[in-house]
Amino acid sequence: MQVLHVCSEMFPLLKTGGLADVLGALPAAQIAEGIDTRVLLPAFPDIRRGIPDAQVVSRRDTFAGRITLLFGHYNGVGIYLIDAPHLYDRPGSPYHDTNLFAYTDNVLRFALLGWVGAEMATGLDPFWRPDIVHAHDWHAGLAPAYLAARGHPAKSVFTVHNLAYQGMYYAHHMNEIDLPWSFYNMHGLEFNGQISFLKAGLYYADHITAVSPTYAREITEPEFGYGMEGLLRQRQREGRLTGILNGVDEKIWNPETDLLLASRFSRDSVEDKAENKRQLQVAMGLKVNDKVPLFAVVSRLTSQKGLDLVLEALPGLLEQGGQLALLGAGDPVLQEGFLAAAAEHPGQVGVQIGYHEAFSHRLMGGSDVILVPSRFEPCGLTQLYGLKYGTLPLVRRTGGLADTVSDTSLENLADGIATGFAFEDSNAWSLLRAIRRAFVLWSRPSLWRFVQRQAMAMDFSWHVAAQSYRDLYQRLKS
């Protein structure tokens, strides 16, 4: 079986969010399952530099100008690159300029990505063509539409990583993207009087996946559906919507082998985690004290991630003697709020604005609780890293957070399945009650260790997801 992933970023070549982490790990896991898997990416500068051995496969004149299709390898995975310097050779973000304005030609840049994905199924590479074209998020959303326009030369899967981003463009661009105008209607890619790349993926794909079972249910409801819930309910009734949890790349996130940690540890030597905590406290300007729980945040600072709730609940956390270490960037108001808290509570609150992949490992390895209070979270990887590192996740019960973290209720403790702390409502009071439960568990060290070991025993490796996708592909092919 031959599978082509169509996407806009891939860790570690280029990353702006969790999408890149998925594409950095899933293809290799599928190859290990015996699937001939390759990836198609735009040749953004960082990606092009990361695959210097890429060779020319073919050249083509397209609606978006002359392109060259290249093929190379990265970490054992075959990578196709769309080399179109007039579209992709721009520094910084792949999506917007230095003033944070979306590029005005994004409609062409990402239509081309979907177009090449579909052309691969008709022989753009004469020596390899996919049975399944697997498109990810709105950037690749037109791939299933182009496949439909070509008579479905391959089956298509469309994965929703975040339904909030919809790839909306004015209708007149239909004249520029090489799709028939008949596709521009309610039963097609039209949405609120515009072209929606996301809706194209949802409407034309043979099967839709979301990145967790709970998120797959949530997006059929108005609260999380962003206007697409009617179509998604229809796909659910047709058996064409599935939730498959993301995994953890254990080559990168594994406390037993993580060279970014001061002290490596395992489920059977969790006491060795203590040195990581000491060094993290020093690095963040916190009082060195192994007797108090250290809460951590590694996140974009946005209200979607619930970071305003953390700021509101912070006095209660500090009054109980806890510490907070935060790594992240985003909303300037939230940034200022956390910096002010650090200035007001030296030794108790440490803040680093920005994002550093290496330091995020030290934070995960050294803290006791990782806070993920998102208002919505399609899957979430942070809580999975927390489980892996014995850093108990404290999460809001939504999306993938609900699927992966079992609260320390009395029943779950008795059944030996508790792995963290979960709260229901998006408010500081609900968050504070969960924080209080964390302090209660912390006061019982043997019970804390028991929950830690249970958390570290959870298997969210990519091979589980790879098997689920393989089963889906086989159903589509049969």
UniProtKB/Swiss-Prot annotation:
Pathway membership: Glycan biosynthesis; glycogen biosynthesis
Protein name in UniProt: Glycogen synthase
Known catalytic reactions: [(1->4)-alpha-D-glucosyl](n) + ADP-alpha-D-glucose = [(1->4)-alpha-D-glucosyl](n+1) + ADP + H(+)
EC number(s) from the headed UniProt entry: 2.4.1.21
Family: Belongs to the glycosyltransferase 1 family. Bacterial/plant glycogen synthase subfamily.
Source species: Enterobacter sp. (strain 638)
Function: Synthesizes alpha-1,4-glucan chains using ADP-glucose.
Keyword Heme (UniProt): no
Keywords: Glycogen biosynthesis, Glycosyltransferase, Transferase
Phylogenetic lineage: Bacteria, Pseudomonadati, Pseudomonadota, Gammaproteobacteria, Enterobacterales
Top enzyme class: transferase
UniProt: ADP-alpha-D-glucose binding residues: K15
Gene Ontology CC annotations of this record: cytosol
Family matches, as SUPFAM superfamilies: UDP-Glycosyltransferase/glycogen phosphorylase (SSF53756)
Any one GO biological process: glycogen biosynthetic process
GO MF term set: alpha-1,4-glucan glucosyltransferase (ADP-glucose donor) activity; alpha-1,4-glucan glucosyltransferase (UDP-glucose donor) activity
